[in-house]
């Protein structure tokens, strides 16, 4: 379920604000979104995997908190991330 190293670095490079940025809310939300998408695909095949379903809900909650933080601090960055990731809200 974890992201591979190349996949993770590609996502980080796409969303980082400056060259050494690996922990900004944008990067964290993008990484969580990719993990959430992978878990959704896993759960489509393994419908009775309740342990993974609970993990999915925790990841969605963490992403929601990060998006709420970003929205309260800088709405323009929030809108940019939402549009780039194709998230609704």
From Swiss-Prot:
<comment type="similarity">
    <text>Belongs to the universal ribosomal protein uS15 family.</text>
</comment>
<dbReference type="Pfam" id="PF00312">
    <property type="entry name" value="Ribosomal_S15"/>
</dbReference>
<dbReference type="GO" id="GO:0022627">
    <property type="term" value="C:cytosolic small ribosomal subunit"/>
</dbReference>
<keyword id="KW-0699">rRNA-binding</keyword>
<dbReference type="InterPro" id="IPR009068">
    <property type="entry name" value="uS15_NS1_RNA-bd_sf"/>
</dbReference>
<dbReference type="GO" id="GO:0006412">
    <property type="term" value="P:translation"/>
</dbReference>
<dbReference type="GO" id="GO:0019843">
    <property type="term" value="F:rRNA binding"/>
</dbReference>
<dbReference type="InterPro" id="IPR000589">
    <property type="entry name" value="Ribosomal_uS15"/>
</dbReference>
<keyword id="KW-0687">Ribonucleoprotein</keyword>
<comment type="function">
    <text>One of the primary rRNA binding proteins, it binds directly to 16S rRNA where it helps nucleate assembly of the platform of the 30S subunit by binding and bridging several RNA helices of the 16S rRNA.</text>
</comment>
<dbReference type="InterPro" id="IPR005290">
    <property type="entry name" value="Ribosomal_uS15_bac-type"/>
</dbReference>
<comment type="function">
    <text>Forms an intersubunit bridge (bridge B4) with the 23S rRNA of the 50S subunit in the ribosome.</text>
</comment>
<dbReference type="GO" id="GO:0003735">
    <property type="term" value="F:structural constituent of ribosome"/>
</dbReference>
<comment type="subunit">
    <text>Part of the 30S ribosomal subunit. Forms a bridge to the 50S subunit in the 70S ribosome, contacting the 23S rRNA.</text>
</comment>
<protein>
    <recommendedName>
        <fullName>Small ribosomal subunit protein uS15</fullName>
    </recommendedName>
</protein>
<keyword id="KW-0689">Ribosomal protein</keyword>
<keyword id="KW-0694">RNA-binding</keyword>
């Amino acid at each position: 379920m974890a992201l591979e190293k190349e996949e993770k670095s590609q996502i980080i490079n796409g969303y980082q604000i400056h060259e050494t940025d690996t922990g900004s809310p944008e990067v964290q939300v993008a990484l969580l979104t990719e993990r959430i998408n992978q878990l959704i695909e896993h759960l489509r095949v393994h419908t009775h995997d309740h342990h993974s379903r609970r993990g999915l809900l925790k990841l969605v909650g963490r992403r929601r908190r990060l998006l709420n933080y970003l929205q309260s601090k800088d709405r323009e960055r929030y809108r940019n991330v939402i549009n780039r990731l194709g998230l609704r809200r």
